[in-house]
Amino acid sequence: MQEIQPPEKRTTLPRKRILIVNCYFDDSRQPIRRTNKIPQAVGPIYLAGAFARDTCDVRCYTEVASGPLEDEGLLSWPDMLVLTGLTNGFDRMLHLTAYARSKNPKVIVVAGGPPVRALPLFSKKVFDYACLGDIEELCDVISEAFGPAYVAKRMLPRYDLAYWLGRIGYVETTRYCNFRCSFCALTAEGRSYQTYDLEHVRQQIMASGKRSRMFFLDNNFYGSDRNHFRARLGLINEMRGAGQFHHWGALVTNDFYRSNENLRLVREAGCELLFSGLESFDNDWLRSFNKLQNTSSPQVEMVTKSLNAGVVFAYGLMLDVTSRSISDLRRELDFITSTPEITIPSFITLSIPLLGTPYFYDCVEKDTLLPNTKLRDMDGTTVLQKPLDDIAEVVRFVDDLQSLKGFHSRVLKHAAGFARLYRSKLTKMQMVLALGSNLLTCAQPISTSFSGLGWLKTRPRPRTFVSSTEPLDHMYTPAFRVDSRFESYFKPTMVTDDIGQLHEDIIQSGLLEIHAPRQSVARA
């Protein structure tokens, strides 16, 4: 007689709750929600793809579109808090860590991104896991913290969690850049340009669902692999034919424009807009920052070539008050706004000596950093270094830049001239994309925020636009009661001390050994 075996005992794994946050300080230093900002942050949805759906409940939050995270209920919810963000958002990571640990002492805090990679020792002291590698490192963290069953078998972006994206999809087809500009955080990290397998790109596009427009978030969509570039265009044509999206845009370096064939190929593939880091119309300044790819052809010629080919040319302008006079910078802005043949910059930023970059070390060597500069001040709207001109004149100039004050009539005249020149060569949407940036710049910060008017009533102190005296954001005051052991988490991370030398926060952070070999994940 066959022996009857007892039924197999099944074990159900407990579900883990994961909160992933893109940490952000707004340039206005107010709690503004940038719901209209393009591009939006997508780091959280890429990180969310590391968690297994059948064992993890994942929520994403971006402080860019939703404002500062101060919801006690949400911050007490997760078993694991995953934090990412830009370099100057490091202190927000500390704030959210303090909030979450005050609500749940057992919460596991994981942090990564540029600030963590720049400050590895500092990060190891405050986070349970300081991830110093690519986003795939999170899979190793999950496996160690919870077990392999909580790791997704295939890591794809969780577009279903991206409540803030709207009709625009975001996909990455390559990683890093093949150039080494001295002010770029990618140069500081020294990582090589990488291409993705086309099947992985296809899977991302399919996972995003059908969108009216797709934006490719590569650091350099053109890159150094010409065959892969053409293959991606072939895939784009295939996906457009299947109705996944209709039009698209991307970020490219200026060497893309050396070949007229490139413009023809992207236009035939449905490209509406390309963003390129033009930075300046001053070739001497570009050479000083190793931005050599921008000096091979005249900037105006490059912009007009793109527009005449039916592709909007978008760019940012970097104004360096430490090496150029205010009168020189004003002349550059006068030139741009009086030249309707070109677009006006989508944004204007001051030069930023980001941690670990050649530019940062050059500033340290030349002793140009102002006293009491905070890491949070590295936002592109705050004077961090000793300027050529009188500081009062520089402050007035920087203040005016926030809305192009003094240039409004020139911008309107430029827009009218631009429309006359290109209305037969660009679609209506392209005209909106091209001219919208001009007019929206004049309306900052309201233009990219439905809650933009709120800051007019809540601003406690006026900005000084100088790092040494700039008031702290309200986020440095806890939004609710936190454990006293986290008091230091709400003090700003300092870059320089009161005499302008590197602060102990930086000296002890691991930054100065940034090029030394290190593990990809540092466990506290």
Model-found features: residue ranges?
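Radical SAM enzyme core and accessory elements
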Residues: M1-I20, I32, R53-T55, G73-M80, ...
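N-terminal [4Fe-4S]-dependent radical SAM core
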Residues: Q2-P14, Y24-D27, P31, L132-T173, ...
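Flexible glycine/acidic-rich beta-alpha junction loops that bind and position SAM and/or redox cofactors
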Residues: D27-Q30, A118-L119, F179, S224-R226, ...
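Glycine- and acidic-residue-enriched helix-capping/strand-helix junction motifs
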Residues: R29-P44
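Glycine-rich beta-alpha loop elements in corrinoid/cobalamin-binding modules
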Residues: L47-K153, I352, G356
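Conserved beta-strand positions in the central sheet of alpha/beta enzyme cores
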Residues: V82, C131, F215-L217, F275, ...
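Catalytic cores of alpha/beta
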Residues: P120-K125, N262, S323-S338
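Radical SAM [4Fe-4S] cluster-binding motif and immediate context
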Residues: P157-A314, L319, D334
